[in-house]
Amino acid sequence: MTMSRSSRSSVLALALATGSLVAAGPCDIYSSGGTPCIAAHSTTRALYSSYNGPLYQVQRASDGTTTTITPLSAGGVADASAQDAFCENTTCLITIIYDQSGNGNDLTQAPPGGFNGPDVGGYDNLAGAIGAPVTLNGKKAYGVFVSPGTGYRNNEAIGTATGDEPEGMYAVLDGTHYNDGCCFDYGNAETSSLDTGNGHMEAIYYGTNTAWGYGAGNGPWIMADLENGLFSGQSSDYNAGDPSISYRFVTAILKGGPNLWALRGGNAASGSLSTYYNGIRPTDASGYNPMSKEGAIILGIGGDNSVSAQGTFYEGAMTDGYPDDATENSVQADIVAAKYATTSLISGPALTVGDTVSLKVTTSGYDTRYIAHTGSTINTQVVSSSSSSTLKQQASWTVRTGLASTAAANGCVSFESVDTPGSYIRHSNFALLLNANDGTKLFSEDATFCPQDSFNDDGTNSIRSWNYPTRYWRHYENVLYVASNGGVNTFDAATAFTDDVSWVVADGFA
């Protein structure tokens, strides 16, 4: 039986009145609308009112063990404190994003396909567990922060739409975290991880890629990745009805059936949905009517494992059948009632904007060395009160407001050279460099870092990359990198990682 619009509104009103997330979740609403979820993924909350099973799994680097994160209560917010306790004094990766629908459509580390990922064997990277903290109704949770090279997939999903079968999907994303790479997607893709032709995908895309279609303004845009094209309307090119997005939290909705599809979106923190397109399949390119969907599920990557995009995912689901607008409107109201909000990205002793600091190594045998620079190379050098004024300046850094504004708003900072004003520490190919600020979005993100508690007891802080949150400032052979705790690069070696990424932040020499 289909729940009426008034009944769905009553269910939502009850949730608002009780201050609870459990009166009806998005997948309860989809089910009541006659289009049940066949996959439901979220690291932030349960998507069914009665769900109290696993949301996601994390693995810690210190001993390789895993733990499962569940809601605090049935239908509730994820138990972030369990993750924090498990991952204390080490790093953690999100290894599994569980399907809450009961179909077992879990998302795991994406395998190689048309493109290889950067991890061992061509697999994609896994997301760091702490890169995307938020609150829901005041309770802390973590999203999935996708850096370029990160991706999740299930090529053997059950119950997903294939061929020209109807389906719907939604996702809640970070509207400020994007790039123009291909392709930050969530949805239906090829089961082979290869590009098998036009119309073999149907996935939500978010970003500023203009290689195919694009919308009004400069983006970012919600679009549909239908394979070999990003679409926001009947045309495969420009579509004025698809607006640029400026919301911090974004609801993105895509649905498709035989010669019919729609694209909708809105502010996930307030208000209602807008319809950006509702009409027939693209007519200026072949292969999209009928569609040839294959039924795999992807997150953070393209159907052929394209891995150059970035974005943040909080929750999403895919349905059996083509949801009506009223059902989606009620899902949006439920998302708004969850009250997504930002929270601090930092921990440990605060670094004060405007202060000049020097950072001392804590690794035994190297602890007379400080972070300095020689030209554009960031390295460690032995520095003391008797060192030359030139060296003291090279080893001193002014703490600035983070150049990436979305991260700066939550505590992250940038480090300007004292002896080369206008130049900042940034990473490029994971090496730390001193470069002049060129004003680009990429530079701002590469030069923004989030201080946190030191991993060892000798330091005050570890310094984490904002846009690659699995990576920290590390000295390796006296040169500085942003390094992960184990990985494919020599400077990612797990041995001595804890000490090598822990620093004493002290008053600057100059």
Swiss-Prot record:
GO molecular function: alpha-L-arabinofuranosidase activity
Pfam families in alphabetical order: AbfB, ArabFuran-catal
Glycosylation sites noted in the Swiss-Prot or TrEMBL record: N89
GO biological process: arabinan catabolic process; arabinose metabolic process; L-arabinose metabolic process; pectin catabolic process; xylan catabolic process
Induction: Expressed in presence of L-arabinol and repressed in presence of glucose and glycerol. Expression is also pH regulated probably through the action of the pacC transcription factor and is higher at acidic pHs.
Record: active site: E227 (nucleophile), D304 (proton donor)
Keywords attached to this entry: Carbohydrate metabolism, Disulfide bond, Glycoprotein, Glycosidase, Hydrolase, Polysaccharide degradation, Secreted, Signal, Xylan degradation
Annotated spans, ABD: 343-510
Annotated residues for binding of substrate: D225, N228, G303, H427, N429, F430, D446, H475, E477, L480, D500
Subcellular location: Secreted
Activity vs pH: Optimum pH is 4.8.
InterPro entries tied to this protein: A-L-arabinofuranosidase_B_cat, ABFB, AbfB_ABD, AbfB_ABD_sf, ConA-like_dom_sf
Catalytic activity: Hydrolysis of terminal non-reducing alpha-L-arabinofuranoside residues in alpha-L-arabinosides
Disulfide bonds: C27-C37, C87-C92, C182-C183, C412-C450
Coiled coil: none
Site entry (Cis-peptide bond), positions: C182, C183
Thermal dependence of function as given in the entry: Optimum temperature is 65 degrees Celsius.
Signal peptide: 1-24
Region annotation (Catalytic) ranges: 25-342
A GO CC term attached to the entry: extracellular region
EC number(s) from the headed UniProt entry: 3.2.1.55
UniProt function note: Alpha-L-arabinofuranosidase involved in the degradation of arabinoxylan, a major component of plant hemicellulose. Able to hydrolyze 1,5-, 1,3- and 1,2-alpha-linkages not only in L-arabinofuranosyl oligosaccharides, but also in polysaccharides containing terminal non-reducing L-arabinofuranoses in side chains, like L-arabinan, arabinogalactan and arabinoxylan.
PANTHER family, per database record: ALPHA-L-ARABINOFURANOSIDASE B
Domain remarks in the Swiss-Prot or TrEMBL record: Organized into two domains: an N-terminal catalytic domain and a C-terminal arabinose-binding domain (ABD).
Name of the protein described by the UniProt record: Alpha-L-arabinofuranosidase B
Organism: Emericella nidulans (strain FGSC A4 / ATCC 38163 / CBS 112.46 / NRRL 194 / M139)
